[in-house]
């Protein structure tokens, strides 16, 4: 009897232990019930089951209530066209940087992903997260993207496709038109020299208005005058630590930007303005972005590096001011700008061909693009009266209450044919070509991407040095005569020369194959 | 033969422990395999095992720059200071709190000193900014109203060792105090009664009863902190100085350095290398410290 009791207890233990172990692993099978439902409904004529494409839709944080209705509407287009159904997967932007790697490492189903929003395609390729899609790119896609396709090409293989076909970026200044009229401030049509800046800022100061001329920001990212200097950062427009090409439409020599006279001039100007009280004095630490400072009436003007969507109307709406734009630098196309938003296919995708076919359809079918961007007409958006291609939220709805598309960051389709949201106006479509291959200046290095793997240590060290010195310099908080030499020395110690040398040799090799 | 049977006797107990053992194995030991990433050029599509092996190359960036010395010094220096102050101030506060007789006031004090510990470092950084801001800071308002020139705190590094230490103590002291207080409460009243009968003063009671009996707790907490000597409170060193470049020589620690250096590339191998290095140093420190304790007060050593 006693023996039996012991055996029984052992068996019980085993069962307990087993249930605990298996409890952990029964997750996978019940993951997507949606798949089975859609599969039943959409089996097509040729007998082949439609492939279910999982598409990453990056947004701010909402979960869309009507996402399934939108999916169905999309399926009505995609099933007859390319025999696939879609599943939209919303990913909040704060998770986007890690979501793809987690999904690939865990081999979860994911096909079409946003690249460049937070992590550049080249980094993703280096980490093995993107699939080679060279053979699937259709002739139409090739024609649409033209030279832009090179930006997503690494070692001769295509890994990403530009999401925005007009990715040129301008540098400009926006100023408060009402204030300018009230105080009689004359702002030139275009700004090119440091005297032009000085001229505007001095007028603002002398006019006696309560606002400062401008905010120099917190020094994170490139300062506007650096953009104005017409640079190609060769993939690092933020810290410019790979070296830069100045006037990239005619030059291909990489130099150390921080050693240049232009940089010294810029720092001297900013220091001078700070001393004269032209700029918001504590912009370095107060935690406001330059746009915030503009919106709360602290400054007269704000600088901005603008892509096509960031129009005057858009920024006026954002800041609540009546803004006027002044060009600092015409639109420029570089690898970095093209790659700020692009599409890639996850390396664990079961059907990369289908994913690319979908992209192909997306860029040609404006109806599909509008569905993806804005949802279903009537319930999620409404055409604005008197406009061609402008939409707004339907009556009584706003970004937070609409059932789909309120806060999407991803962009689907051809910018030229798809709708735009208010406050943009039809003028948007007139200016769009200025940002594309036709209108924008093209960097000679467009398509080149620096492979940092050989100098990864130096790059990390250089970026850390830039983070240490640059913000205080470009925000005019320290005397450049004292700090720049120290900065340059620290950069050299960190190995910037090796980085530039490696970068140049890669660039030269790349130019030869072009 | 006898030994064998004894082993068999414990089988049910082992099986009873099986879930726990499995949990430890899966949760704490299997991930150790991930340490390999620090020595590889990690590629998601190849996986951990197949990614190319690169030896110590991933560690280079930690040692190659002039920052290597600064970040090591800052990390260890601040940690030693914090350990010392946390212990001394924590024990003192715990003793004071224990002497408060009124129940209501005791609870109020206890809550008041614990409250900052529950705040996020981002909130703390803004609280600090309210005091230290250039234009809007309270200290600068005070200085200018007294006719003194304002101080640009976020650009003057001399103040920061003091500011960081103050902020750290203000925020973390409550937590240590509660632990010390718990052990003081556990000390039997009869010791104090006996001491009082013998005519011992309050100070003598503290010195000869409370502190010696607190020793095991102190040693344990210090040993545990020693195990974190090469890690720093990222929030404290990144958020509170508002990521200001001018202050890096006194605020840059190994965590903030790694964060800044890899912000752009997000390289998982390089960051694993940093974490590996930190863990290795902490492991060595805790072993050494434990051995020292073993030598001087064997019964209080952790292992």
Model-inferred region functions:
Chain A
Residues 1-3:
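N-terminal secretory signal peptides that target proteins for export/translocation
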Residues 6-9, 24-189, 193, 252-256, ...:
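Conserved N-terminal structural module of periplasmic/extracytoplasmic solute-binding proteins
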Residues 100, 104, 197, 204-205, ...:
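Hydrophobic residues within well-ordered alpha-helices
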Residues 19-23:
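C-terminal motif of bacterial Sec signal peptides marking the signal peptidase cleavage site
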Residues 157-226, 244-285, 347-354, 361, ...:
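Helix-loop-helix "hinge/cap" segment bordering the ligand-binding cleft or interdomain interface
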Residues 111-115, 213, 300-305:
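Paired acidic/hydrophobic, glycine-rich loop segments that form the ligand-binding mouth/hinge
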Residues 122-123, 221-247, 268-399:
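Extracytoplasmic/periplasmic substrate-binding proteins
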């Amino acid at each position: 009897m006693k023996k039996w009791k012991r055996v029984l207890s052992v068996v019980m233990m085993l069962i307990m232990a087993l249930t605990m172990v298996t409890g952990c692993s029964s997750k996978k099978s019940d993951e997507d019930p949606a798949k089975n439902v859609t599969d039943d409904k959409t089996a097509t004529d040729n007998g082949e089951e439609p492939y279910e494409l999982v598409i990453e839709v990056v947004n701010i944080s909402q979960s869309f209530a009507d996402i399934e209705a939108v999916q169905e509407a999309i399926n009505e287009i995609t099933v007859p066209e390319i025999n696939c159904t879609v599943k939209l997967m919303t990913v909040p932007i704060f998770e986007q940087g890690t979501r793809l790697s987690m999904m690939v490492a865990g081999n979860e189903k994911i096909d079409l992903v946003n690249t460049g929003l937070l992590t550049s395609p080249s980094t993703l390729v280096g980490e093995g997260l993107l699939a080679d899609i060279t053979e699937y790119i259709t002739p139409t896609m090739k024609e649409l993207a033209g030279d832009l396709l090179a930006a997503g090409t690494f070692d001769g293989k295509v890994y990403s496709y530009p999401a925005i076909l007009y990715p040129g970026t301008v540098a400009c200044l926006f100023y408060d038109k009402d204030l300018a009229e009230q105080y009689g401030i004359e702002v030139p049509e275009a700004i090119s020299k440091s005297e032009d800046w000085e001229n505007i800022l001095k007028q603002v100061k002398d006019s006696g208005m309560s606002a400062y001329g401008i905010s120099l920001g917190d020094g994170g990212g490139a300062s506007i005058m650096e953009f104005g200097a017409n640079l190609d950062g060769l993939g690092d427009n933020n810290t410019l630590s790979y070296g830069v090409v100045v006037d990239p439409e005619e030059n291909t020599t990489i130099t150390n930007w921080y050693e240049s006279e232009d940089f010294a001039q810029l720092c001297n100007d900013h220091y001078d303005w700070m001393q004269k009280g032209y700029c918001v004095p504590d912009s370095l630490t107060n935690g406001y972005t330059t746009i915030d400072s503009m919106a709360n009436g602290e400054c007269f003007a704000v600088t901005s590096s603008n892509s096509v969507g960031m129009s005057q109307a858009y920024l006026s709406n954002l800041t609540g001011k009546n803004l006027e734009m002044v060009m600092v630098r015409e639109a420029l196309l570089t690898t970095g700008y093209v790659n700020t938003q692009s599409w890639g296919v996850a390396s664990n995708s079961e059907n990369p061909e289908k994913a690319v076919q979908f992209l192909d359809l997306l860029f040609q079918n404006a109806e599909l693009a509008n569905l993806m961007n804005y949802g279903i007409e009537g319930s999620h958006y409404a055409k604005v009266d008197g406009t061609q291609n402008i939409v707004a939220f339907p009556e009584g709805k706003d970004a937070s209450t609409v059932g789909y598309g309120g806060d999407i960051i991803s962009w689907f389709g051809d910018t030229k044919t798809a709708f735009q949201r208010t406050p943009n106006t039809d003028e948007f479509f007139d200016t769009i070509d200025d940002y594309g291959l036709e209108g924008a200046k093209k960097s000679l290095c467009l398509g080149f991407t620096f492979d940092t793997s050989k100098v990864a240590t130096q790059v990390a060290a250089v970026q850390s040095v830039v983070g240490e010195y640059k913000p205080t310099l470009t925000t005019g908080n320290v005397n450049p005569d004292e700090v720049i030499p120290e900065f340059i020395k620290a950069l050299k110690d960190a190995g910037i020369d090796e980085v530039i040398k490696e970068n140049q040799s890669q660039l030269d090799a790349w130019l030869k194959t072009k | 033969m006898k030994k064998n049977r004894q082993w068999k006797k414990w089988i049910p107990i082992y099986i009873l422990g099986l879930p726990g053992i499995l949990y430890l194995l899966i949760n704490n030991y299997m991930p150790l395999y991930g340490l390999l990433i620090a020595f590889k050029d990690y590629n998601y599509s190849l996986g951990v095992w197949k990614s190319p092996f690169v030896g110590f190359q991933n560690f280079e960036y930690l040692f190659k720059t002039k920052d290597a010395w600064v970040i090591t010094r800052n990390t260890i220096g601040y940690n030693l200071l914090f350990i010392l102050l946390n212990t001394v101030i924590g024990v003192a506060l715990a003793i004071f709190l224990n002497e408060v007789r009124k129940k209501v006031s005791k609870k109020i004090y206890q809550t008041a000193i614990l409250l900052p510990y529950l705040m996020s470092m981002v909130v703390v950084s803004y609280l600090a900014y309210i005091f230290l801001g250039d234009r809007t800071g309270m200290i600068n308002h005070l200085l200018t109203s007294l006719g003194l020139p304002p101080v640009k705190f976020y650009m003057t590094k001399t103040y920061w060792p003091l500011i960081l230490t103050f902020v750290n103590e203000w925020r973390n002291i409550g937590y240590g105090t509660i632990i010390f207080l718990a052990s003081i409460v556990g000390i039997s009243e009869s010791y104090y009664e006996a001491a009082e009968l013998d005519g011992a003063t309050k100070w003598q009671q503290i010195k000869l009863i409370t502190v010696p009996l607190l020793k095991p707790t102190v040693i344990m907490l210090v040993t545990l902190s020693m195990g974190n000597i090469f890690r720093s409170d990222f929030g404290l060193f990144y958020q509170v100085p508002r990521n200001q470049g001018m202050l890096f020589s006194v605020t840059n620690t190994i965590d903030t350095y790694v964060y800044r250096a890899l912000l752009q590339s997000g390289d998982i191998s390089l960051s694993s290398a940093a974490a590996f290095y930190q863990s290795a140093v902490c492991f060595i420190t805790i072993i050494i410290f434990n051995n020292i304790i073993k030598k001087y007060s064997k019964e209080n050593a952790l292992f």
